[in-house]
Amino acid sequence: MPRTILVVLSEWGFWGEELVGPLESFDAAGYHVDFATPTGKRPVALSPSMDPTYVDPPLGRAVVAQEMAEKVKAIDDPQNPRLNQPKNLKAWLPERPYWSSPKFIREMEAYYKQLDTVREQDLQHYDALLIVGGSGPIVDLVNNQRVHDLILSFRQMGKPVAAECYGVACLAFARDLGDRKSILWGK
């Protein structure tokens, strides 16, 4: 059975090369890849990541090669089924209860039980987690508790977690509820 990577993408746009580069490596190594987005919508590449004439303002130069632009356009094409039907994180992972809920303790017990079930029945089948960057993750991944739960679950299971560009901010905000410190604390 091939190893499987879970790739989380923003519904507000991902930087094309940050998906295409790892995906080419995963495909070449024979890995199976599953995609996930916050609500199960098909992710889309940010248009500058498909434009070889785009000049990155801080760098003052073009940052997208023609070959990469074509590869990003190919995977972003709605006719390409590869990114269709990503896993829906909202439907897959439980919502953490509000601290002010009158039934907070019981709701937290149920939340942890559901999270344990997802970890034991679903996440154990994955070998690694990748969070793709671009500006979109700032909108719908960085403060997304379900993304944090994925990160913490993979970490708890001793499985690799990788993030690119703005996707790294998800790691900074993934905190253990016990000590409230970021998993990046002290690193």
Residue ranges and their predicted role:
Residues 164-169:
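Short, thiol/selenol-centered motifs that function as redox-active sites or metal-ligating centers
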Residues 1-157, 170-187:
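Extended, subdomain-level signal for the structured scaffold at the beginning of enzyme domains
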Residues 160:
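Active-site cofactor/cluster-binding pocket
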